[in-house]
Curated annotation (Swiss-Prot):
Residues 26-40, 130-157 have a biased composition (Low complexity). Residues 59-68 have a biased composition (Gly residues). This is Complement C1q and tumor necrosis factor-related protein 9. Disulfide bonds: none annotated. Residues 24-82, 84-132, 134-193 form the Collagen-like domain. It is found in: Secreted. It comes from Bos taurus. Residues 42-57, 69-88, 183-193 have a biased composition (Basic and acidic residues). The gene is C1QTNF9. PANTHER family: COMPLEMENT C1Q AND TUMOR NECROSIS FACTOR-RELATED PROTEIN 9A, EMILIN ELASTIN MICROFIBRIL INTERFACE-LOCATED PROTEIN ELASTIN MICROFIBRIL INTERFACER. Residues 1-19 form the signal peptide. Keywords: Collagen, Repeat, Secreted, Signal.
């Protein structure tokens, strides 16, 4: 590329000389930019054959080659010389069975074999002939008693037997005649103080509270304030007294009447036996009742409102009480 720039500069200078007859050398120009790479040239021709190179190092041994084809059978070799006995070879495979040899001599008798299993029972044989009479056997045991013979004549009277055992006690005889009065005996020693017999007991007193006042009608009143129930004969859950000691009892009730009328009944085993009725007149009032009842074991006694909710004015608070009491007067046992 630089050659082209030089030729161009020379041409310009020559033209200027011809026109002006004189030419002065100018300052060198600024170097141009490098040109682009030209196209690659064609491959050169093959050079002449070079000299033979030095021998290379031996290569690594090659792998085993494939088996060649089986060659033709060779001619028999000459007889070899007998050498020393070789090593015993491995045992060959078993050959085919040989032909049967001649029958051998009879061997000695073998030992007695084990007893064989019992064979099945054979068929019943025919009856044999009667054998000769055997010798007389020993005397047999006594046979059973024969039937009773005829009654013989009465024998002579025997000797008296031994005395028999005493017979059972006879019946009691009639009372004898009363004997004369005996003499007065001496005064005995003072006895010890005896223990008092344990008397059966049963008693309770229960009352209403602010929560249980104005009880529902036609059902046992459940008194939930326990004043006395040591023996547990009053059942708080059911409102009933249950008899655990048969006898005669006294039951009583005291009622504070307020806000409504009252009508109550004392009930024994479902039957009403005592009734009390009181009307409310605008101020507190008191009503009561009491009765003596004979009871058997398991009998039930309770108090209930009758006549509906208009007659359940049984009242209780911290200053007023409604109570139900019962206790045993005496047992019947």
């Amino acid at each position: 590329m630089r050659i082209w720039w030089l030729l161009l500069a020379s041409g310009v200078c020559t033209g200027m000389v011809s026109s002006q007859d004189t030419c002065k050398q100018g300052h060198p120009g600024i170097p141009g930019n490098p040109g682009h790479n030209g196209l690659p040239g064609r491959d050169g021709r093959d050079g002449a054959k070079g000299d033979k190179g030095d021998a290379g190092e031996p290569g690594h041994p090659g792998g085993p080659g494939k088996d060649g084809m089986t060659g033709k059978k060779g001619e028999p070799g000459a007889d070899g010389h007998v050498e020393a006995k070789g090593i015993k070879g491995d045992q060959g495979s078993r050959g085919p069975p040989g032909k049967h040899g001649p029958k051998g001599l009879v061997g000695p008798p073998g030992e007695k074999g084990l007893t064989g299993e019992t064979g099945p029972q054979g068929q019943k044989g025919e009856k044999g002939d009667v054998g000769p009479v055997g010798p007389e056997g020993p005397e047999g045991s006594t046979g059973p008693s024969g039937p009773t013979g005829l009654l013989g004549p009465t024998g002579p009277i025997g000797k008296p037997g031994p005395k028999g055992d005493a017979g059972p006690l006879g019946p009691q005889g009639e009372p004898g005649v009363r004997g004369p009065r005996g003499w007065k005996g001496e005064r005995g020693e003072k006895g010890k103080i005896g223990e008092m017999p344990a008397l059966p007991k049963s008693a309770f007193t229960v009352g209403l509270t602010v929560l249980s006042k104005f009880p529902p009608s036609d059902t046992p009143i459940k008194f939930d304030r326990i004043l006395y129930n040591e023996f547990g004969h009053y059942d708080v859950a059911t409102g009933k007294f249950i008899c655990h000691v048969a006898g005669v009892y006294y039951f009583t009730y005291h009622i504070t009447v307020f806000s409504r009328n009252i009508q109550v009944s004392l009930v024994k085993n479902g039957a009403k036996v005592l009734h009390t009725k009181d009307g409310y007149t605008g101020s507190e009032d008191q009503a009561s009742g009491g009765i003596v009842l004979p009871l058997k074991l398991g009998d039930e006694v309770w108090l209930q409102v009758t006549g509906g909710e208009r007659f359940n004015g049984l009242f209780a608070d911290k200053d007023d009480d409604t109570t139900f009491t019962g206790f045993l007067l005496f047992s019947s046992s």
